[in-house]
Regions:
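Basic, glycine/lysine-rich polyanion-binding surfaces/domains
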Residues: 1-233
């Protein structure tokens, strides 16, 4: 609770949300979706960040009676109308700006039978490109493609007051106690706004090639200036 941006000290079993690990200046170091189940907190971080988040949390244990370990779980994401899940499935709802989403956490050695059970219940398999299209529509960032080392939480609208849904806490709790980076969050929220924000850019298809992640966005006209950069395409 004292390390991440989400309020977790009174989280009940079944609670799901997101959380951020910030540096002292309020810049985002790690993002994770989380689930509380049977006395454990499951943090789902992007694979390139999992080990560094694990290392940080391990260093912060001190005298606390807690064990931190990497699991052998994989995540299956269901989008669209709900279907019946296997009885032993560990799942969490994820509120975002796209289609209804349920993440199912599955032991790696149970992946194939779980997929078969979901298909039997009506799910259809789709690849990463299909998921990425839904993620972009939902304004859900990929930390490596859409954000950078200067990103602060208010740059992602869904992290602060999750898209106007009062039942979903987003990734930042604005009324919890101190945590690293909180001063930046409070200052931006109460006194101003982020100088940058994640936005959806529509491409009209008139150019023969697509832009690449990292390409600059510029204003048109004689005195063009850089106003942003391309993320996920």
């Amino acid at each position: 609770n004292n390390l991440l941006s989400q309020k977790l000290d009174d989280a009940p079993d079944g609670y799901s949300a997101a959380a951020l690990d910030l540096d002292p200046q309020g810049r985002v170091l790690h993002h994770a979706d989380l689930l509380v189940h049977d006395g454990a907190f499951y943090l789902d971080a992007p694979a390139p960040q999992a080990q560094s988040l694990h290392n940080y949390l391990t260093r912060m244990v001190f005298w606390s009676d807690v064990t931190i370990e990497l699991t052998e779980l994989v995540v299956l994401t269901l989008l669209g109308d709900p279907i019946d899940l296997p009885e032993d499935a560990l799942s969490r709802p994820v509120h975002w700006g796209g289609k209804p989403r349920i993440d199912v956490l599955v032991p790696r050695d149970r992946l194939e039978p779980t997929v078969a059970a979901l298909e039997a219940a009506g799910a259809q398999l789709a690849g990463l490109m299909a998921y990425t299209a839904e993620r972009v529509t939902a304004l859900e960032p990929d930390l490596l493609l859409d954000l950078d080392e200067k990103t602060i939480p208010h740059e992602v609208p869904g992290w602060i007051g999750r898209l106007g849904d009062d039942s979903w806490p987003g990734a930042v709790h604005l009324e919890k106690g101190c945590y690293r980076g909180q001063e930046t969050v409070a200052r931006v929220h109460n006194l101003g706004r982020s100088p940058r924000v994640l936005a959806l850019a529509h491409l009209d298809g008139s150019a023969p090639t697509l832009p690449a992640p990292g390409d600059e966005l510029k204003t048109s006209g004689g005195r063009s200036r850089v106003v942003g950069r391309i993320g996920t395409v």
